[in-house]
């Protein structure tokens, strides 16, 4: 189980590191052009706060558990990503993008598995 959780944590960290960097550095138009269409419904300050949340979560998925320093932050980061994915799914649903809603559901499920799995190991 530990190996599966590490794989999920690593995959989620890579995805959300990339997404967070994109949301923190790109213009609205460029994000939409590169596939980050869900941001269209939100003002840029919300997008930038989401970017910061994704970047912090990417680190929180790996570093606390790997170092043993405040390991409770790992399931907390995963739970935070679940909240982000609910917002993303809502946004893509409003934009009638079922494939993106499904992808958000997959990321939600992976983050939930990490949150529950790591919480059980505390």
Range-by-range predicted roles:
Residues 1-122:
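Membrane-interface extramembranous regions
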């Amino acid at each position: 189980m530990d190996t599966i959780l590490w794989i999920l944590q690593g995959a989620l960290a890579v995805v959300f590191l990339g997404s967070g960097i994109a949301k923190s550095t790109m213009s609205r138009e460029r994000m939409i052009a590169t596939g980050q269409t869900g941001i269209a419904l939100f003002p840029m300050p919300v997008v930038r706060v989401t970017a910061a949340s994704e970047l912090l979560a990417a680190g929180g998925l790996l570093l606390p558990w790997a170092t043993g320093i405040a390991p409770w932050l790992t399931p907390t980061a995963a739970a935070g990503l679940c909240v982000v994915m609910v917002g993303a799914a809502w946004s893509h649903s409003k934009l009638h993008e079922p494939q993106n809603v499904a992808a958000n559901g997959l990321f939600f499920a992976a983050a939930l598995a990490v949150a529950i799995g790591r919480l059980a190991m505390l």
